[in-house]
Amino acid sequence: MLTEILSRESCAKCRVCCVFDRDDVWEIPVVLPETADYIKKNIDKNAELEPYEDGYRFVMHFKDSEELTYCPMLTDKGCVLGDKKPFDCKVWPFRVNRINDNILGITVSPVCETVSALPVSKLSSFINKKYNEHGSLADIMLDYANKHPYTIKPYVDDYPVLKVVTNK
């Protein structure tokens, strides 16, 4: 989905999107129930998933506040979930954030240095360009957020806003 602005090679070398510290708990992707079932049946029957709203999140174990913990689905070859990876992961470093009660924003995480180094105008054009029969990446993200509102992340001040919409 993002290969126009981020090569698979650059993405695979970095993996910063798959590592978390205690301050990143809000960024842990939400796994839909059907994906959680798939993980338990096909990948790791002992995978630790905790209920989160209408979905699940991976349980991350931190020994101290400085420790980094990798997503349990990350291997040397990348994400074992492939096409079944959480929506948050499919569209990262883009996010739907709640700016206030009535406003949602599509933002880009500055943690992804490759993408966030691109001009905001290029990123804005990218997310608003028709992607497939479902519309632009922005349309797809907002549709998903409307269907799964618990996946909307809180707004973080240093995340550049690429699109603003009124919350339905």
Residue ranges and their predicted role:
Residues 1-168:
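Short loop/turn segments that flank or connect secondary-structure elements
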